[in-house]
Amino acid sequence: MNILILGSGGREHSLAWAIKQNPKCDNVFVSPGNAGIGQICNCIEINILDAKQVLKAVKEYSIDFVLIGPEAPLAAGVSDVLKNEGILTFGPSKASSQLETSKKFTKEICDAAGAPTAEYKSFASLEPALAYIKTKGAPLVVKADGLAAGKGVIVATDIEMALTAVREIFGGSFGDAGTSVVIEEFMEGEEASLFVLVDGKTILPIGTAQDHKRVGEGDTGLNTGGMGAYSPAPILDQSVVNKTIDRIIRPTMYEMMDRGMPFTGVLYAGLMIKDSNPRLVEYNVRFGDPECQVLMMRLGGQILDALLSTAKGELGDVKINWADDHSITVVMASSGYPGSYEKGTVINGLDDLPSDSNFVCFHAGTEKQDGKIVANGGRVLNVTTRANTLIEAQRSAYQMIKNIDWPQGFYRKDIGWRGL
């Protein structure tokens, strides 16, 4: 079958890499892709937010299955249009994507479903939000309501920081994402993520992961889209996974069905775990990035069967075969990220890296210029390895990085520390 993946990051590179291992797959097309994806797939240029352009590509390239990687096309309703045209598509509807695109919506769903999460209040204007912060005190978590590329969440350790965050959100720092704000209690515990596939009725867990959102070692500095991840997450043992599904995910899915917007796709539950009890931090309605990379490294080609069954509503027949392995990904980013950074810097040494089922350098913000691979984004490379233990996987990843010649790049040197 011919498959079209929408997206251009390390997530999409890892999905393409895994899907290509399945004998059902004939050709993989990716739009817009990147330099690394272009080495293993056909990259095509279309506006992935424009459903008409996506439909045209589906017909032109005889596509049998469309997989939507990032959140923006989901928020734009591309999945709805494709499904209405009878195209087999993996990705939730625009309505059910609100579990990610609106923090306020998610909180209301959790309230109705009785799913444990942080206490909160939402505000549509500045002054009441400022007054609330002064009343509550710190620490607090301030969230822009809409999509902000993973950077719209501020953990405010003092009142002044919280006040500044709210002023920046309402002042337009996050564009349309900042038309309203959610202010939450600061939850204590350890954060980790559970990924499940949902076909509207059946819930299938497909792995756990822990990412590293802060830019600096020791989880310091600014929030980013993610500087690395590893799987499995030790804190998410089977007991905690079962509690998460029973107390959080299943009640959420029932509430979505009751509202006439059943969820189908992948649901990423960001969790805070304390004393083996999970509370919901956030939902994402697509594979995380960089969490997807470690999941794909462990799942391989069987993921295509699971994605197809999800899209067809036949998830009840699927079983995931797990190896007793560990995977880690270390993100190499452009100096200055998550602030301003230089584009067009040349990356050497990539051709000499090992590449097999245990070692892959997934590309994110790269492109090809004059025959050379150059950086054109903030997060640029995802050095990903798999081994029998986490420490072995970690050593392999950092050994691979030593062979990459990119003076303008940087990376955290402690990815995986919580699991060791």
Predicted regions and their residues:
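ATP-binding N-terminal substructure of ATP-dependent carboxylate-amine bond-forming enzymes
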Residues: M1-K94
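Short acidic-hydrophobic, aromatic-tinged amphipathic segments that line or gate anion-handling sites
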Residues: C43-L49, K121-S125, A156
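A conserved helix-loop-beta module that forms one wall/lid of the active-site cleft
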Residues: F90-G152
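Internal nucleotide-binding/catalytic subdomain
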Residues: G152-C292
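Generic C-terminus detector
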Residues: T366-D370, V374-L420
